[in-house]
A protein has these predicted regions:
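Phosphate-group recognition and catalysis centered on beta-loop-alpha active-site segments
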Residues: 2-252
């Protein structure tokens, strides 16, 4: 029988090594869980992005305000199409960007929109595109916003404001389509077409633009379903989103 003193240290050695291994495995497991959680959060965030939601179907956009945003987005959320609101922006004398009508600050509206997973189409009007882009980036809404301008100069400024922010470029002809492609360069852009544009023009701009925006055709001669069947459209702007959704559901 071995002397007790000769074996007294052995249990400590045997117990210590598995303990270290267990601790190491525990740390590794925690790290894996954290990475998995981060990946899940990132995936969920991307799922709410504009371009990702375009792949899942037509996006219906309706005019809204900073004050009515919550109610409007809640109403759209009950419909089959993703919710998108078109907001008019303005600059105050103190430099703050607000949503009209009303005086809601764009920063607050962006924060609310992110929580509600609401997409936004922002009309720049007289605002500085760089200021708007900075607010959008700070709110982590770059992938959920598209900027709209009525002038070429403001459009060019918006394209330079942030390389990751989608900018809508008005296109009325084949010449405009090629000019928009040259203007944007490597910057992602959306093409904003009139509903009276030809199906061929829609098809042409679809080759280069990240998204195609148009308005609901107000003509009894052509149903919305027929209109969309001949044109690649990603976003339809309409003041009557419920009627448009019902029309599309009735035709399917």
């Amino acid at each position: 029988m071995p002397h007790p003193d000769t074996t007294s240290d052995k249990p400590h050695k045997c117990a210590g090594s598995p303990l270290k291994r267990c601790l190491g495995k525990g740390v590794l497991a925690v790290g894996v869980c954290m990475l998995a959680s981060a990946g899940f959060v990132l995936h969920q965030s991307k799922a709410y992005g504009l371009l990702e939601r375009i792949h899942h179907g037509l996006i219906i956009c309706t005019p809204g305000t900073g004050l009515s945003m919550t109610a409007a987005s809640a109403g759209l959320a009950r419909q089959s199409s993703p919710a998108m609101l078109r907001l008019e922006l303005a600059s105050q004398e103190d430099g703050r960007v607000i949503v009209m009508p009303g005086s809601s600050q764009l920063s607050d509206v962006l924060a609310s929109s992110r929580r509600a997973h609401t997409l936004l189409m922002l009309d720049l009007n007289n605002t500085n595109p760089a200021d708007v882009a900075a607010l959008v980036r700070k709110a982590r809404m770059l992938d959920r916003v598209v900027l709209v301008s009525s002038s070429r100069e403001t459009t060019e400024t918006a394209l330079q404001a942030d390389p990751d922010l989608l900018v809508a470029i008005p296109i009325h002809s084949v010449r405009d389509a090629y000019a928009a492609h040259r203007m944007a360069g490597t910057h992602p852009y959306a093409a904003y077409l009139s509903p009276t544009a030809s199906p061929n023009l829609f098809t042409l701009v679809h080759r280069d633009a990240e998204a195609i925006i148009t308005e609901n055709p107000a003509t009894p001669a052509l149903s919305t379903e027929e209109f969309l069947a001949d044109r690649p459209v990603d976003i339809v702007v309409t003041p009557q989103p419920a009627q448009l959704t019902q029309a599309l559901a009735g035709g399917s």
